[in-house]
Amino acid sequence: MKKIAVLTSGGDAPGMNAALRAAQRSSLYHNCRLFGVRNGFKGIVEGDFKPITRDDVSRIINRGGTILGSVRFDEFQEPSVQSRAASQLQAFGIDGVLVVGGGGSFKGARALSRHGIPVIGIPATIDNDVPSTDYSIGFFTALNTAVESIDKLRDTSDSHQRCSVVEIMGRSCGDLTLYAGIASGSEIIITPETGFDEDEVIERVSRAFKRNKRHALVVITEHMTSVSDLAKKIEEATDFETRATVLGHIQRGGSPKAFDRIIATEMMHHAVHLLSKENGDKILGIRGNRVVEYDIEEALNMSKPTRELQYNMIAQLKD
């Protein structure tokens, strides 16, 4: 009976628990024994392995977060630590590892692969910044959370004829901001892909209020500028009350939406199948409505395609 380990790494994403449930169910089907690794790659180094049973996953498909935990472990970049992790896996008799996480996690997976450990990566990050998949686990739940929050801000902004500047997660990828902006009808969408022109933002907000609009919504990807400073500058330049809101980590939490549960289950089932057939060293993804697989090196060297269709659309729909 093959022994498979599974870990969650990086920032948590809604749907990770659905992936863990699928790993256990699929392991039963393929006659494999599944072990959970607590706290990501740190847990491998510390030998923190725990058998995952039916009961462990019987009520987690609808839960946010990850029952295995996830911690930042920068020490794993050191070759000596990677070697120790591989030795722990070999000593425990692990035949393959399932890594649920984002791009940084997949670099860790590649390190294990280079030490002879069969590894499969399953993309899970609300940032949706993994180039080898159209959508990562957690993205659509975070998107719904962002849109629901923006809808509420629109209500109060409209009541007071106010501008709201909303910071959305995503790091260097603007997908979450782009889709949240489209779905919420935001007047201005600012992402790493669009760039940031402060004067243009102020001018467009000013034009919106001159047309007697009751509100203006500006959504912007984190780390591009201080939303508090931008809100102050908009208010000073336009004389319209402006408020800044940072959605923050609320975007990572909550019960995963149906689509995240589905792709988590599909990708994890495929991942366990691959390891059961001694076929590792892959990163999985979703293309269209299919699960696809890439060699680790190929996946890590891919570039994230620009959402050209969507960006062209919002350019045409500017007020």
Model-derived features: positions:
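Short beta-strand elements at the ligand-binding edges of bilobed clamshell
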Residues: 132-143, 255-261
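Short, acidic/small-residue loops that bind anionic groups at enzyme active sites
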Residues: 34-35, 113-136, 190-194, 246
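Short Gly/Thr/Asp-enriched flexible loops that form oxyanion-binding sites at enzyme active sites
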Residues: 18-23, 103-117, 177
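Accessory alpha-helical/coil subdomains and C-terminal extensions
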Residues: 99-101, 111, 139-241, 245
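Glycine-rich oxoanion-binding loops at beta->alpha junctions
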Residues: 44-97, 105, 137-144, 148, ...
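C-terminal non-catalytic interaction/assembly regions of soluble proteins
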Residues: 226, 233-319
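N-terminal phosphate-binding or glycine-rich loops at protein starts, especially the Walker A/P-loop
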Residues: 1-45
